[in-house]
Amino acid sequence: MNVYDKVLQFGSKKARARGMALNKLSRNRLEDIYAGSGPLVFGFGPIDMVDPGSLNPSIKTLDTVYVAAVQPDNQYVVHHFVPGRNEWVETDASTHQPTALVGVLVQDHKAKTREVEDLKSQLSQLRMEHEILRHEYERLKLKSPIVKPFKPLKVLLFSLLLGLLFAGVTNGARTGTCYAYDEEKDTCLYWEWKDSREVAWYDSYVTEALAIYNRACVYVRSKEFMTYLSLVFQTVFNWYFCATALAVYYMARAENPIVMFVTLALATLSQFQLLAVAVLPLLDFSATMGLWLSMVVFYMSQQISILVSFCVLVLSVMIGTFMADSEYAMMIKGHAVVFAIVCYSHVAMILNIPPWVVSLTMVCYRLWRVCFVFPAERLEIRSADGKVLHTVPTHPNWTAKVTRFVQSLRKGLRTSVAPTARIVPDGIAIVEAREGVGTCFRVKNNLVTSKHVVGSDDAVKIRWGAQEDMARVTYRHPTKDIALMALPTNLQTMPAYKFAKAITDGPIVMTAFDEANLLLVAVTEGVRVEDHMTYSVATRNGMSGAPITTVDGRVIAVHQTNTGFTGGAVIFVPEDIPEVRKISKREQELEDRVKQLEGMLNMDQAYVDSNLIVDLVREAVQREMKVLRTELANLGGFSQKKKGKNKSTKRKRKAVWTEEEYKAMLEKGFTRDQLRIMADAIRDQYYDDEDEQSEEEAGYPDWSDPGDSTDIENEWFGYEQSWKELEPAKSGVVVNTLPKDLVFKYSLDNYPISKQDIQAVAKELKIYEKAISDIISTSVSTDGKWKDDVDAQKILQELDGLWWGINHTLWEHGLMPFTQRRKRVQQPKNSKGALKTRAPKSAN
């Protein structure tokens, strides 16, 4: 019934075994009566029953099985089994102290367990509310401004860059006249400077702006309009203005702007200007280094710079062959861009193309790509079967990576590590269904996954390593996102997960496959909220149905949600797996027969009220009984005393068999106790020994109308056959049977065999008859004696085994064994014969 009852097993073991056998025949089961109770105690006790075999009602005391336990409401309840009714009935009996004490403790333990579960649920709810409030507090809390530390190196580099940029727009040249010159010393003795002033860097811009303004005011449609427009472009796309703005931006926002400062400085010296900045998103590390090298060489010699960039491109083509296709293509693309801008810059220098035209060209190219091409940010590298191997960004932008790398170094060090966890790498498999792909794992003889993975499919494909097979979906949980599948034959060696004893907040482990079929293991903190588990972990497609385990490898939940970084799972406990009860062949036949009868009943168009039929039968029986009473009352002298009741002496018990018959039966293997029981049974068929001293009037008992239809149904249909569940037991003692009586004892010729027997076990009966015939013919001579080379005990043991086997086969098919059937009566060989089927004559 429960674990306490299995361990303690109070009461008599014999009574327990008998009670379990009777429980199979009972209309109400002990599992339902004592559901949720403590340990049971079994014992034998008396019960008063009305003897149905006598004409006069009499009370007969029988021994039956008593069962007692403490119910969930702490009530000590006792039931006993009532034969005939085949039902457990509540009764009053003495209290078994150990059972009562343990039962009360069990119920108290269950109450405390429920209380603890409620407290855990409340604690989880409070923790979740605390996390929400803490998040809201952090959101509403006023953040203090972050003061960045003063870095002299950054300021120095920024000052040098500004000085380099402003040096290109300043005019520091001064002219004059030498009036006295010393040829020996090659020096000017008297120099007169001309009146000149240093041109400020903004004078040209102011002059140009005023000129544009004046000319626009005079006449906007003049021929010089295009000149004005070119001046505007020169102002907007001026390299020094753009470089200054970019340097200020990186100075304020970037943690490490040195890389950008170096690029801007080299672009200013080499006159690459905006070209160098515009192509940075297309360059990886090697291409960025090639750009720096080309700009340095370009400052010294343009022709050599073109040669150097081309050599670097060829070298990258040759050396990069060991790299992956995506990385190789990205590197070649970057070096090709470097070679192209070096050539473009050289052509611009030769043709005296203004710098603003080059800048405008790059801006137009980038605008065209953004507005019309719509380039993707990432490229997915897939295999031949469509699996995503990895993703590659279309713009490597190595300079941005360097900035992020430096920022990552500024993060605080971890003060703790994740706990060591036990994983089962071969314990999960991939589920492929029409709705998508997921993960599954084995628990007992079931494969478990999420219900939304299998969808409405009846069968899905399971891939476990190199093995593939189809699995049938056997169960979908009504309230949880859990589905069970039958374990295929090819996956019998798959490791199985075990359930955790308790599910609490703490470290959890998720083992799953991602969409690229890579094994991922994550250890994080999980929080239980009612029937769900929440945790923060990077989740991907294909992880649905993955097992969520403790650090000991015990399963506690099934992963179901995927929001990118936060995950969720549904709690998985043993109660979520339905209990599978094995249906016997007899029960299956009865179910099929019931369905057949229900179908026939549904096809019948004529509906007959069952209550009307019962009333008609009751009226007919009552009318017939009245007629019989009248006829019996009109018969004279019908009432008489029983024979043998008018004598004061007790009737003598006569022998049932003759001496020869008695000895012959002893030789056949029957014991004296067995013959005595058989003789008493034969005498009981002809004599009434209950009231030998009393004189009663023979006749029918008084008739009384039944109270309701229930009494009639119990009287007519309230009996069941109890032989079905009584399994034949194999005897351990071999009876010494004479060889000439083997055929009579083991042959089936003396037993009635029905049509149902032949339909069910015809093959087994034929095999049994042939085996019996072969054994007897090879071990018994024609004169009815054992052969010389035969071991009689071994032959008898073999015959007993065959006899027990055929009876057990009948019992398995729901048929009455031969041990419970009556043999056909044979005429005895003596002249007197057996006891006649009438009472012996009186001695008087």
From Swiss-Prot:
- Transmembrane stretches, start-end: 231-251, 257-277, 304-324, 337-357
InterPro entries in the cross-refs: Astro_1A, Peptidase_S1_PA, Peptidase_S1_PA_chymotrypsin
Key word Kinase present = no
**GO MF:** 5'-3' RNA polymerase activity; serine-type peptidase activity
What keywords sit in the KW lines?
Answer: Coiled coil, Covalent protein-RNA linkage, Host membrane, Hydrolase, Membrane, Phosphoprotein, Protease, Serine protease, Transmembrane, Transmembrane helix, Viral RNA replication
Which reaction is this enzyme known to catalyze?
RNA(n) + a ribonucleoside 5'-triphosphate = RNA(n+1) + diphosphate
Which family is this sequence assigned to?
Answer: Belongs to the astroviridae polyprotein 1A family.
According to UniProt, the name of this protein is: Non-structural polyprotein 1A
**Whose protein is this, by species?**
Ovine astrovirus 1
